[in-house]
Amino acid sequence: MYKLVLIRHGESTWNKENRFTGWVDVDLTEQGNREARQAGQLLKEAGYTFDIAYTSVLKRAIRTLWHVQDQMDLMYVPVVHSWRLNERHYGALSGLNKAETAAKYGDEQVLVWRRSYDTPPPALEPGDERAPYADPRYAKVPREQLPLTECLKDTVARVLPLWNESIAPAVKAGKQVLIAAHGNSLRALIKYLDGISDADIVGLNIPNGVPLVYELDESLTPIRHYYLGDQEAIAKAQAAVAQQGKSAA
């Protein structure tokens, strides 16, 4: 049996402000830093260790990983940074308040943009300052692979090559693997691992800063999965994530 640990970054400044973030490189709040440290403590207390870690190229995930490594005294563990683990690109919604957007377009439309499998938000214009083309962290990524908007289906398509070519082989080689990433890049991976349908993926909500453990068989098919920590608090955090895209009315 193999184990794989996933963690969504701690609360970011735009999580706190209930804004669509996507590829915008915002940092953690103090609460987010605290969540990440607590995640590291939980993992250490539960006896976990890691041989390699994967994260995105966005600081909220990177800093979360730093905190986890620090708490576990694993700062030496090699880290793979990949744009393929970035959050889903929210296109023209990037930076907008989720509740205000829902009040303008309706809860149903915003739910479709946030959680449907194959409907992306409106795209950025190529010349928009939020477009990734001029960002040095993507200098080696072919321009045609860089998105101006994404649905979850698109996110799955960019996450899976990293899983198939690097993460899965590491797990099968017996390495203890940690992935510190984002709500939708993790939803994309979980959809693939658990075989969740396009319709049912809408209901999957991942809380910030809580370690999610997957136990996998020899073919990397999930046997079971579970969150570490206070289960009641985790359930409340998942419910809060589900409420983010609804209007205040």
Curated annotation (Swiss-Prot):
Enzyme Commission no: 5.4.2.11
Give the positions of the site Transition state stabilizer: H182
Class of enzymatic activity (EC top level): isomerase
* Catalyzed reaction equations: (2R)-2-phosphoglycerate = (2R)-3-phosphoglycerate
Instruction: State where (2R)-2,3-bisphosphoglycerate binds.
Output: R8, H9, N15, T21, G22, R60, E87, Y90, K98, R114, R115, H182, G183, N184
Q: Which InterPro entries is this protein grouped with?
A: His_Pase_superF_clade-1 (IPR013078), His_PPase_superfam (IPR029033), PG/BPGM_mutase_AS (IPR001345), Phosphogly_mut1 (IPR005952)
- The active site annotation covers H9 (tele-phosphohistidine intermediate), E87 (proton donor/acceptor)
Pathway linked to the protein? Carbohydrate degradation; glycolysis; pyruvate from D-glyceraldehyde 3-phosphate: step 3/5
- The answer to whether UniProt assigns keyword Isomerase to this entry is yes
Which keywords belong to this entry?
Gluconeogenesis, Glycolysis, Isomerase
Q: Name one GO molecular function term.
A: phosphoglycerate mutase activity
- The positions annotated for binding (2R)-3-phosphoglycerate are T21, G22, E87, Y90, K98, R114, R115, N184
CDD domains for the chain: HP_PGM_like
What is the superkingdom listed in this entry's lineage?
Bacteria
Q: Which SUPFAM superfamilies match?
A: Phosphoglycerate mutase-like
Cystines in this chain: none
Entry's Gene Ontology BP terms = gluconeogenesis; glycolytic process
Record's function text: Catalyzes the interconversion of 2-phosphoglycerate and 3-phosphoglycerate.
Subunit and partners: Homodimer.
Q: Which NCBIfam families match?
A: pgm_1, PRK14115.1
Per the similarity annotation, which family is this? Belongs to the phosphoglycerate mutase family. BPG-dependent PGAM subfamily.
Name the chain's protein.
2,3-bisphosphoglycerate-dependent phosphoglycerate mutase
Organism field: Burkholderia pseudomallei (strain 1710b)
Q: Which gene encodes it?
A: gpmA
